[in-house]
Amino acid sequence: MSMARGPATPPITKGILKLARQIDATSTPDYVAVEPGEDCLPGQCFENVAATVKRTGGSVQHGWRLREQPAAYVEGEFYAVWRRLDGNLIDVTPRPDGVTEILFLPDTRLVWEGDPVEPRRMMLNEQPCYCGSGMPFKICHGLAED
């Protein structure tokens, strides 16, 4: 059965793989099912996973939720999912957009400590940088493509 994907859950494209390698060359992106947890709130992945671990066991898996704006950019948002006792990853954070799976890149190097972590972005063309500098993104933020 195919899971519902929206603009927020891209196919695994060359752009996605390139961004994934820039973030963590040792991990591979994969799809993770969204199964909203008990009393979990949208937009609160770190708190939701911590509460789920406390209530049912398992552990927190930090990483990056990967998204693509076709023909514009790919983006990684620092994120947390629940690693069940059987090792499977589940996104317990409810999705108001109805998406039933996310594209997730595990990252064992970073741990959420309560402070925001800047998203990682890579332009797919010569679009101006999102920061408003007027420079091409890959020059402005040093993510020049090979």
Positions of the model-derived regions?
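A structural boundary/capping signal
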Residues: M1-C131, M135-I139, L143-D146
